[in-house]
Amino acid sequence: MPNSHGNVLNNISLNSKQNPRSISKSCPNDKDARQKSFKTISAQALVRVQGAGYKLGDVKLKDAEVKEKNSLKKYDCKNATQEKKEQEQVFEKTVAKGSVQKYITKTSKTNSLFIGNLKSTVTEEMLRKIFKRYQSFESAKVCRDFLTKKSLGYGYLNFKDKNDAESARKEFNYTVFFGQEVKIMPSMKNTLFRKNIGTNVFFSNLPLENPQLTTRSFYLIMIEYGNVLSCLLERRKNIGFVYFDNDISARNVIKKYNNQEFFGNKIICGLHFDKEVRTRPEFTKRKKMIGSDIVIEDELLASNNLSDNARSKTILVKNLPSDTTQEEVLDYFSTIGPIKSVFISEKQANTPHKAFVTYKNEEESKKAQKCLNKTIFKNHTIWVGPGKDKPVHNQIGTNKKTKVYLKNLSFNCNKEFISQLCLQEKIRFSEIKITNYNSLNWTFCGHVECFSRSDAERLFNILDRRLIGSSLVEASWSKNNDNILNEIDYDDGNNNENYKKLINISSMMRFRTQELSAHQKGLTSQFQQVVSPFSSYSNSYTNMNSLVATPMKPHPAFNLITNTVDEKLHQPKRTKQENAEILESLKKIINRNLQRISISGLNKEENLRSISEFIFDVFWEHDSERLSHFLLMTNTSLESQKILQKQVTRAAESLGFTV
């Protein structure tokens, strides 16, 4: 036993000397670790030798363990290789299967038809029962709302055979289908392209009051010239559209029916393109290539050859609700007769709109003015009258009238002010009349009758678009009825009963006789010349700054206010905190409007502060209540925005900014 012990130790020591380089290169810590591991191994070897009795058995055991580990590694490698091959085979099968499915999908193409104008009660089962007579019919789909699951009024029909799809379209297109006339056409995603490839034919002056001219009969006539994708008859306008699948068919139809009789009426037809396409720069070149004689740019041009005056066919509709659409106006006014066009003016939200409706015939236009005036439309009383051209300012050369109509007159632009102005400018007049009061913007309307055309032209040039008393005066050569429903008749005399109602309006009662404040009296004459449009009135009662909303002399009707009432009108003085708040609001609103004012340097904080304080001190005389009300109006009133911009410009000029 002692000898075996020594042999084992010698064997271990010999094994440890097989790689002397690694030992020599090791650090001292590694040597200590190796010595400890050697001691542990030697101790284990002693135990094995003592238990087995000889060294050979221990060596055989080690060899067996090594062989077993090698065999396990080979088995794992073989299994991994086999699994990889199996995965590759599965992938190849999947790819082959997918390619077959793609090939099947390509070869078995479905022909889809769009079916529109379906009744809400029509279901997919009802569609299947009708179209199952075609052998290649596959399925029917009714499109529904995602949340409510209600029918959207259209769906799709799928056929395997293209011929069956065409037969179904010709048989059922524009026929009554469960109580409604349906439209069936090929499913096309790019409708804009379909409408603008030169195959959309427009028809005007169709006799749609003729019961024989139905959409179905119109469709059957048009398919004789080619494949019709869809057609439309607009009975409210006596117009129609036909979409062909090629431009040759479209040209043949135009050649056949343009300026020809159709069901007893002489009609006009031509190629039609959407407005979006017509406004593109390249459309002019395209129009020349197609032929300008067969292109109709707008449906309004289709009736230019008619002898009636177009102006007499147009009516003006006022006080329409702000949410009114063209379709609603078209439905309401087409009860009188066919309409050529409808135009709704664009105004700000929550304000009454007006519309211009043009009829086909002058008789129907007169009938609409008589029957629909002051009727209820969407809970609003509308005003219907003759349509007039929009007033064009400063085009006086063609005018021979001597009466100038004025609107947006503030309280300080009263009869006395206008008469003093005429005397100063040597304008001869026979009458100055204030006729109406507008309750929406607290302004007056009136007119001035001059002796001659030259006097009227001079007065027009002086007052038109002039800011007087916080209101932008508008002059015109014809009476404007835009706010006729919001106006109160007014007489210059003090016995007007209607005007007494105005006295109870607290917001207006604060306009009273005042004298210039101390800070305004201290202004230099040069500054007064800059801010006042009529600087030569400095010695009269009209020398007040024209941009100040409070007048120097009140309107004659306000003489009815007694002294007792006038004493109650005095407002309590505002605190510094309230003034600071209104100045901060004014500064923010001015900052928002700077993009409309081309003055450099105003966007700086200190400059905005100076401009705001100047406007508050000079133009509004520290009256924070009136200024706060005015700032609220700037959110909805374009006129108030223009007034504020004018005040900012005048203030910037006075403070030395380059305008």
Swiss-Prot record:
InterPro entries: Euk_RNA-bind_prot, Nucleotide-bd_a/b_plait_sf, RBD_domain_sf, RRM_dom. Residues 1-35 are annotated as: Disordered. It comes from the Eukaryota. It holds the Pfam family RRM_1. Keywords: Cytoplasm, Repeat, RNA-binding. Residues 111-189, 199-267, 313-389 form the RRM domain. It is found in: Cytoplasm. This is RNA-binding protein MIP6. It comes from Saccharomyces cerevisiae (strain ATCC 204508 / S288c) (Baker's yeast).
